[in-house]
Amino acid sequence: MTINDSAISEQGMCEEEQVARIAWFYYHDGLTQSEISDRLGLTRLKVSRLLEKGHQSGIIRVQINSRFEGCLEYETQLRRQFSLQHVRVIPGLADADVGGRLGIGAAHMLMSLLQPQQMLAIGFGEATMNTLQRLSGFISSQQIRLVTLSGGVGSYMTGIGQLNAACSVNIIPAPLRASSADIARTLKNENCVKDVLLAAQAADVAIVGIGAVSQQDDATIIRSGYISQGEQLMIGRKGAVGDILGYFFDAKGDVVTNIKIHNELIGLPLSALKTIPVRVGVAGGENKAEAIAAAMKGGYINALVTDQDTAAAILRS
């Protein structure tokens, strides 16, 4: 969703000016949406839609001035313990949609990090797609270029499908996992795949989800059919605690060797991911605490968005 800065309304204002005025009346003057609609001669529905556009485009940003916003104490401890560049810990809320709230937190972090026309590399998973859905207007207005970090077009559509048609998206034209290591090697040598992988490694910022072996059936990589339950069991027995982009690592953050899927994946390996300057991990749930800690120890992420309960569990582990 983008702000139309060329169309002039009946009131003689472009859409961006309408958004700015509505935001001022709503947040600074405390007017209701009905009062604003009367003042500007707009329908209440139009006022509501313009407020939403303002949030999605980044014109309107809500800042909560409290030392508890973002759970400052947890953020400080995580930053020090794991040498993180950026941390956002969202307050815990019982029975809330954790994935959606993490997506909002991650979107806010990315809006503060990304500069116009920079490139954002995205990994697959529910957390990253939740984030992408809340960045649509910002990506379009700031001309942010997107590139996927792994194959598997379908895994990205819940996020990419929400973007403006004018957004620049570079997708790896291959599955996430090939049926054999030989086929994976062949596909990765195709120019159309190789070029996207090179673009991904050249990204300014990356955002990835973090899976945990302890999630069992709830893990995205299992629900998406990329590995079987039997494979997950064997991977766990080899000491793996979590994965990023399908690559599994142990509690120390070291990639686990002799795992079949690693040779069949089509995507950026973790060693290449580490060369991207800012690598944001977005994940929540106490059952992911060990995996998130391991991802930070391995240096695969240097920025984190998580929730209060998960942050506490990470610091206890």
Curated annotation (Swiss-Prot):
Activation and inhibition: Inactivated by phosphorylated autoinducer-2 (phospho-AI-2). Phospho-AI-2 acts by binding to LsrR, which is then unable to bind to the promoter regions, allowing the transcription of the target genes. Phospho-AI-2 triggers the disassembly of the tetramer into dimers and reduces the DNA binding ability of LsrR. Dihydroxyacetone phosphate (DHAP) may act as an anti-inducer and inhibit binding of phospho-AI-2 to LsrR, preventing induction of transcription of the lsr operon.
> What happens when the protein's gene is inactivated?
Deletion of the gene causes a significant increase in expression of the lsr operon and results in accelerated removal of AI-2 from extracellular fluids. Deletion of the gene affects the expression of a number of genes associated with attachment, defense and pathogenicity. It also affects sRNA expression.
Per the entry, induction is: Autorepressed. Part of the lsrRK operon, which is positively regulated by cyclic AMP-cyclic AMP receptor protein (cAMP-CRP) in the absence of glucose and negatively regulated by LsrR.
Q: Report the locations given in the UniProt record.
A: Cytoplasm
Keyword Repeat attributed = no
User: What is known about what this protein does?
Assistant: Transcriptional regulator that represses the expression of the lsr operon (lsrACDBFG-tam) in the absence of the quorum-sensing signaling molecule autoinducer 2 (AI-2). It also represses the expression of the lsrRK operon. Acts by binding directly to the lsrA and lsrR promoter regions. In the presence of phosphorylated autoinducer-2 (phospho-AI-2), LsrR is inactivated, leading to the transcription of the genes.
Q: How does it assemble?
A: Homotetramer. Dimer of dimers. Interaction with phospho-AI-2 triggers the disassembly of the tetramer into dimers.
Question: What domain comment accompanies this record?
Answer: Contains an N-terminal DNA-binding domain and a C-terminal ligand-binding domain, connected by a linker region.
What is this protein identified as?
Answer: Transcriptional regulator LsrR
Organism of this sequence: Escherichia coli (strain K12)
Gene this chain is encoded by: lsrR
